[in-house]
From Swiss-Prot:
GO terms for biological process: positive regulation of translation; translation. Its main location: mitochondrion. GO terms for molecular function: GTP binding; GTPase activity; mitochondrial ribosome binding. Residues 1-42 form a transit peptide. Belongs to the TRAFAC class translation factor GTPase superfamily. Classic translation factor GTPase family. LepA subfamily. One of its GO terms (cellular component) is mitochondrial inner membrane. It is found in: Mitochondrion inner membrane. InterPro entries: EF-4, EFG_III/V, EFG_V-like, G_TR_CS, LepA_C_sf, LepA_CTD, LepA_IV, P-loop_NTPase. This is Translation factor guf1, mitochondrial. It comes from Emericella nidulans (strain FGSC A4 / ATCC 38163 / CBS 112.46 / NRRL 194 / M139) (Aspergillus nidulans). GTP binds at residues 73-80, 137-141, 191-194. Promotes mitochondrial protein synthesis. May act as a fidelity factor of the translation reaction, by catalyzing a one-codon backward translocation of tRNAs on improperly translocated ribosomes. Binds to mitochondrial ribosomes in a GTP-dependent manner. It is a peripheral membrane protein. The gene is guf1.
């Protein structure tokens, strides 16, 4: 009560302050919390807050001097390190302040990879004039292609980065064609020229031969030491076109990304194409029709820095006040405009939704933590809409979720984020891929959960065809490993499509492979067989007929639903033997015999037995009492048989956890 009275006195002392200015008032953390959480607050119009020196400098820059660009490359070619040097060069951060400033997730710093495309605004003075540069650091791994594609929507050009010692790799090729198809201006950059093994001339030759790029404007740099990095920004200013937009038109704003903040709620990353947006405006979503009041707008500099306004051509963040009621309201690719301008504004085309192609089941280690796991998953999915989520239940592991991902690394990173950012203790099943069932009546179903796969009789009587997804894999590696790579691809049911040398010693090999083989540690085997020199990229190539079966684990003839997998028939013997051997290691002995089997339908493909505890029923007998001995042994045998028939096998939760661990 005392706190409320003090707040009332404080507010009455400044009756003319608009609520939005309280949000911006220095040191007003309590006021901020009050006005950003209450649903009764409604802003009455754009707020007027004094400009900071930074914002005054930005407001003086016309859209003709905006440059939006990204850095694209194969994984581990130095994108994040180069981003650091550019931020230092423009004075956005202090030299040596932090390594990989734009890699904000713990999992990114641990693995040394970029998972989420991150943005930053910079101001660069070129020939006496300020330029507003907007940089996007994109992921390099194929699993995060959707992040790269979305980043291109807010850019007018890209730095195509190539490692001077490794040359063009698989994802360099993929990222080039993706950027080229969207009409981005590409600037070749050769990185790591300070390495003893660097061959910049060879890398430039590869760029000319593979992409027909003019390498006269290529910049040779070392992001690690900063060598020649200062030559990049003049090239960006002169080569990359300014964004097209008009501040006088009605607001047209694209939602590029979103994430969750425990204090502010859902925060949206937006690209303003036309008009301007400021705190206090009421905007409406074209996708949902829901109206919101803008609570705050700002830029990433590199941290969230509030601004009075975001204008046409800028990329920044906004959050609403009151915030979005549900995280699903933040639809990536949605267009926003001011209320009343809906008919005057044409919504932007948005993004193609990526399809999840790798599925796992996730269960809490402790069933009491199910709600915490659900909240954690929903918060992470807000930041990554390519993940699909469905609730499911298992007799062995209880309530859980069926999660869909773009690839195995995508899945692994999500699992790490659940553990690190939310403290979740989870059990994850091995990854599997969907199967298409074509019924004889012409209907088609996509099966992502093995427990919904038709049984053996239905497959024989009602199913016309089973199909599995295939991908077109592009592999690049030194020619000395050609035999090893071809052997690996053939062993994984691959079909060779093309083979070409893009240099006298470097090979590009294309194979059509089942996606199921790719998620079964294909990349690890490829790296091992080529001593780490091979790189891999892939894209979907459709569905093909296949002999798919359901492999089950049986414990005393009862199926363990959490372990079932859909596999190609040729893999059943190998996988079945692995399953029963591994599961036996984690099952405790009991009073009766436990039979562990791997089965396809009614056919048993592998078996192991856990022997029971032995009780010596003959201990008190006289050695000569043969008939009594036989009678007691027969009685014990019958008792064990009866116990096995009616007794439930008690399998500890940790046994499943150990069995499903990689």
């Amino acid at each position: 009560m005392r706190g409320c009275l003090q707040l009332a006195r404080w507010l009455s002392a400044a009756p003319n302050w608009p609520a939005s200015s309280l949000l911006k008032a220095p040191g007003s953390s309590f006021a901020t919390r009050l006005f950003t959480t209450t649903s009764s607050y409604k802003a009455k119009g754009p707020s007027k807050v004094p400009m900071t020196d930074l914002e005054a400098r930005i407001s003086a820059i016309p859209i003709e001097r905006y440059r939006n660009f990204c850095i694209v490359a194969h994984v581990d070619h130095g994108k994040s390190t180069l981003s650091d040097r550019l931020l230092e060069l423009t004075g956005t951060i202090k030299p040596g302040m932090n390594k990989q400033v734009l890699d904000k997730l713990d999992v990114e710093r641990e693995r040394g990879i970029t998972v989420k495309a991150q943005t930053c605004t910079m101001i660069y003075n070129h020939k006496g004039e300020d330029y507003l540069l907007h940089l996007v650091d994109t992921p390099g791994h194929v699993d995060f292609r959707a992040e790269v594609s979305r980043s291109y929507a807010s850019c007018g050009g890209a730095l195509l980065l190539v490692d001077a010692s490794q040359g063009i790799q698989a994802q360099t090729v993929a990222n080039f064609y993706l950027a080229f198809s969207q009409g981005l201006e590409l600037i070749p950059v050769i990185n790591k020229v300070d390495l003893p093994s660097a061959e910049p001339e060879r890398a430039l030759e590869q760029l000319e031969q593979s992409f027909e790029l003019d390498t006269e404007d290529a910049v040779l740099v070392s992001a690690k030491t900063g060598l020649n990095v200062e030559q990049l920004l003049p090239t960006v200013v002169e080569k990359i076109p300014a964004p097209i937009g008009d501040c006088k038109r009605p607001l047209r704003m694209l939602l590029v990304d979103s994430w969750y903040d425990s204090y502010k709620g859902v925060i949206c990353l937006v690209r303003v194409f036309d008009g301007e947006v400021r705190a206090g405006q009421q905007v409406v979503s074209f996708a949902t029709g829901i109206k919101y009041y803008v609570g705050e707008v700002g830029i990433q500099y590199p941290l969230e820095t509030p601004q009075t306004v975001l204008r046409a051509g800028q990329v920044g963040y906004i959050f609403f006040n009151p915030g979005m009621k549900r995280s699903k309201e933040a639809k990536i690719g949605d267009t926003f405009t001011t209320v009343g301008s809906e008919k005057a504004v044409q919504p932007l085309p948005g993004f193609e939704e990526p399809k999840a192609m790798v599925f796992v089941a996730a269960y809490p280690v402790d069933a009491d933590h199910f709600e915490h796991l659900e909240d954690s998953i929903n918060q992470l999915v807000l930041n990554d809409r390519s993940i699909t989520v469905q609730k499911e239940s298992s007799e062995a592991l209880g309530a859980g979720f069926r999660l869909g991902f773009l690839g195995t690394l995508h899945c692994s990173v999500f699992e790490d984020r659940l553990r690190q950012e939310h403290g979740a203790s989870i059990i994850i099943t091995p990854p599997s891929v969907p199967v298409k069932v074509v019924w004889k009546d012409g209907k088609e179903d996509i099966i992502t959960n093995p427990n919904r796969f038709p049984d053996e009789d239905d497959v024989r009587m009602k199913v016309a065809e089973l199909q599995e997804p295939y991908v077109m894999a592009t592999l690049t590696f030194p020619d000395e490993y050609l035999g090893t790579v071809i052997e690996l691809c053939e062993a994984n049911r691959g079909e060779q499509k093309s083979l070409e040398y893009f240099t006298p010693t470097q090979v590009i090999l294309k194979y059509e492979l089942p996606l199921a083989q790719l998620v079964d540690d294909f990349f690890g085997k490829l790296k091992g067989g080529t001593k780490g020199y091979a790189s891999l990229d892939y894209e979907e190539s459709g569905w093909k007929p296949s002999n798919i079966v359901k492999l089950q684990l049986l414990v005393n003839k009862a199926p363990v639903d959490a372990v079932a997998r859909l596999v190609h028939y040729s893999q059943t013997d190998r996988l079945g033997r692995q399953w029963v051997t591994k599961f036996k290691e984690h099952v405790d002995r009991q009073l009766f015999e436990i039979i562990i089997q791997a089965a396809v339908g009614k056919k048993i493909v592998a078996r192991e037995t856990v022997k029971p505890y032995r009780k010596d029923v003959l201990a008190k007998l006289h050695a000569s009492d043969v008939s009594r001995r036989r009678k007691l042994l027969e009685k014990q045998k019958e008792g064990r048989k009866r116990l096995r028939a009616v007794g439930n096998v008690v399998i500890e939760h940790k046994a499943f956890q150990a069995f499903l661990a990689k």
